[in-house]
């Protein structure tokens, strides 16, 4: 039902544009291509900066052998590639300005006339070096620059309605939702520094995403803060950043032109390479990279704005289609109701999409904070006949888990809850009384982890299997699963029959405590279910009242329009009769004049 609803939502919006715009791209797609190009441009600048630093560190070697130095040759190639990119930007600056200053409407641009393949320009190949500090001989290889922009841009895409088919396995808006990655989080420094206690993803702190209550996530409060702040921004985002970027790029181009005036086919020309100008070039590249980051952030903000408004248009299209099917008048929205109507649309149609996007975001976030080592990714082909490993205790007594471990557990808990909610929403879409898992209990840092039960008598006849017992530190989802296992195991005792899987039937102390804990948790679940059910009913009643007022206003407008038309018709009839009477009054005079002329 989730897939059908998303497809149904987009069919009405896409079908009107499919035939007329087969050869065109929408603004959001072009903005993504622009971001990809800027990302590739940024990587080329970083590679050139590293190359310049290597040359400066080995000046004494390069002065001795300029002609056949591969490090110097690679630097010249990179500078030529950068010069081509800068020339490309200068020639197509009108296209950049048009994309940055466009209005946030779903319009199309003609790719044949205006677009000069931003995507292909961003996919240029650049040369990079593998440096070996203990060896003067350098080896170089071609590397492909086709990496995507950022994970958060994929998260922003979670609102991209042109990619709705991809959202079932996705990302943006993300989405948490539509937040942009303002810095390149793919840097090696981020992978090395995994012990930091505060992680941020764009402008949204990760802790806010992990610690948010599931109930607040359903109501969309945090998401709507991002939506409102985006819609409140004025048009022409990043125009100053673009001007600074173009001016600095022009200066870089002139600098590169002076340095690279040589024929690369003849390696002897490297003798004239001006090493003394590299310091000034490096300083200019640092300034250029800073301006490039600001421009990239502005483009991502603009892309986020486009995608949010595109989601709103898709929602309006869906509501109109539903109204036509039910024979109701098409709903209209004023500018004052824009944000509130967008909020209703997200709550009505976007909650399931939100679940999948948040889960995808958390997976990518976990991979970035805790990157897997190469040794972990290598598959083990040989199968050894080893004894089964015994599960270790969560932690020794009195030992606190690390900060990274807490973050990892928080991410896993949120992902598990999303899986539970998503499953219940799909299977019980028409029933409001879905039993959600409660928020996991936050463990105090000073709390000791209980490794075993002191009250448990270590006798095999006192339990069936250890797996269905749970302690107070378990998540509610785990408890719910173990409740089901418990009910299945104790069902034969209730009927007086012995199950084949139960060999030892003896209700010990631990079993009684276990059943009491189950009853307590069931009562807690009922209370939370009742609270959520009441909130859903209040929200549904509020929507019904708004819809009734909306339809009543439409009917009143129709009545006023009919009365106005009737009055206009009456006035037209009165004027027509008056004109006819004046014409009839003039007719006899005209006949008398004609008779007098005949007599003469």
Swiss-Prot record:
Residues 119-199, 376-404, 429-457 are annotated as: Disordered. GO terms for cellular component: extracellular region; plasma membrane. Residues 143-190 are annotated as: 8 X 6 AA tandem repeats of [VT]-N-D-[ED]-[ED]-D. Sequence repeats lie at residues 143-148, 149-154, 155-160, 161-166, 167-172, 173-178, 179-184, 185-190. This is Merozoite surface protein 9. Its main location: membrane. Forms a complex composed of MSP1, MSP6, MSP7, MSP9 and MSP3; within the complex, MSP6 and MSP9 mediate the binding to the host erythrocyte. Interacts with MSP1 subunits p19 and p42; the interaction is direct. Interacts with host SLC4A1/Band 3 protein (via the 5ABC region). MSP1 subunits p19 or p42, and MSP9 form a co-ligand complex that interacts with host SLC4A1/Band 3 protein. Residues 281-445 are annotated as: Interaction with MSP1 and host SLC4A1/Band 3. Residues 376-390 have a biased composition (Basic and acidic residues). Not glycosylated. Residues 128-141 have a biased composition (Polar residues). Residues 143-191 have a biased composition (Acidic residues). It is a peripheral membrane protein. Belongs to the plasmodium ABRA family.
């Amino acid at each position: 039902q989730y897939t059908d609803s998303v497809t149904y939502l987009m069919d009405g919006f896409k079908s009107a544009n499919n035939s007329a715009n087969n050869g065109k791209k929408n603004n959001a797609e072009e903005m993504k291509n622009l971001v990809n190009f800027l990302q590739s441009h940024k990587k080329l600048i970083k590679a050139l900066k590293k190359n310049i630093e290597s040359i400066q560190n080995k000046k004494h070697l390069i002065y001795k052998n300029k002609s056949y130095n591969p490090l110097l040759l690679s630097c010249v190639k990179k500078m030529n590639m950068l010069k081509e990119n800068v020339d490309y930007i200068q020639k197509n600056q009108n296209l950049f300005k048009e994309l940055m200053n466009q209005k946030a409407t779903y319009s199309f641009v003609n790719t044949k006339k205006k677009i000069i393949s931003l995507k292909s320009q961003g996919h240029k190949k650049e040369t990079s070096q593998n440096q070996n500090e203990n060896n003067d001989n350098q080896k170089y290889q071609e590397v492909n620059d086709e990496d995507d922009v950022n994970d958060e841009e994929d998260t922003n895409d979670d609102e991209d309605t042109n990619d709705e088919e991809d959202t079932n396995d996705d990302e943006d808006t993300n989405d948490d939702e539509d937040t942009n990655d303002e810095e390149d989080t793919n840097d090696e420094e981020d992978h090395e520094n995994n012990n930091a206690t505060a992680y941020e993803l764009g402008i949204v702190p990760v802790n806010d995403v992990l610690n948010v209550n599931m109930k607040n996530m359903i109501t969309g409060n945090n998401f709507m803060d991002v939506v409102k702040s985006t819609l409140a921004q004025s048009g022409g985002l990043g125009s100053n950043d673009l001007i600074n970027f173009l001016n600095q790029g022009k200066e870089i181009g002139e600098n590169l032109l002076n340095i690279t005036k040589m024929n690369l086919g003849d390696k002897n020309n490297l003798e004239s390479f001006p090493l003394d100008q590299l310091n000034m070039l490096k300083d200019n590249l640092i300034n250029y990279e800073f301006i490039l980051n600001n421009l990239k952030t502005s483009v991502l903000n603009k892309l986020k704005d486009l995608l949010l408004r595109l989601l709103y248009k898709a929602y309006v299209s869906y509501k109109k289609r539903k109204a036509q099917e039910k024979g109701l008048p098409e709903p209209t929205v004023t500018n004052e109701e824009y944000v509130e109507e967008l909020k209703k649309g997200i709550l009505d149609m976007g909650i399931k999409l939100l679940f999948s996007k948040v889960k995808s975001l958390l997976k990518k976030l976990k991979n970035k904070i805790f990157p897997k080592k190469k040794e972990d990714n290598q598959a083990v082909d040989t199968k050894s006949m080893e004894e089964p490993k015994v599960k270790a205790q969560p932690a020794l007594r009195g030992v606190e888990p690390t900060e990274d471990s807490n973050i990892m557990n928080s991410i896993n808990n949120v992902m598990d809850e999303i899986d539970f909610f998503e499953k219940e929403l799909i299977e019980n879409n028409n029933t409001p009384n879905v039993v959600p898992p409660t928020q996991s209990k936050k463990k105090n840092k000073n709390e000791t982890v209980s490794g075993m039960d002191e009250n448990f008598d270590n006798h095999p006849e006192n339990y069936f299997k250890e797996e269905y017992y749970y302690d107070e530190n378990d998540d509610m989802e785990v408890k719910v699963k173990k409740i089901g296992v418990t009910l299945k195991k104790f069902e034969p005792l209730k009927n007086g029959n012995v199950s084949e899987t139960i060999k030892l039937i003896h209700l010990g102390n631990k079993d009684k405590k276990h059943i009491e804990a189950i009853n307590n948790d069931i009562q807690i679940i009922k209370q939370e279910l009742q609270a959520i059910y009441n909130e859903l009913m209040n929200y549904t009643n509020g929507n019904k009242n708004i819809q009734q007022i909306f339809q009543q206003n439409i009917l009143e407008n129709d009545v006023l329009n009919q009365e106005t038309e009737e009055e206009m018709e009456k006035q037209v009839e009165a004027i027509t009769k008056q004109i006819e009477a004046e014409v009839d009054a003039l007719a006899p005079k005209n006949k008398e004049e004609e008779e007098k002329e005949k007599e003469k």
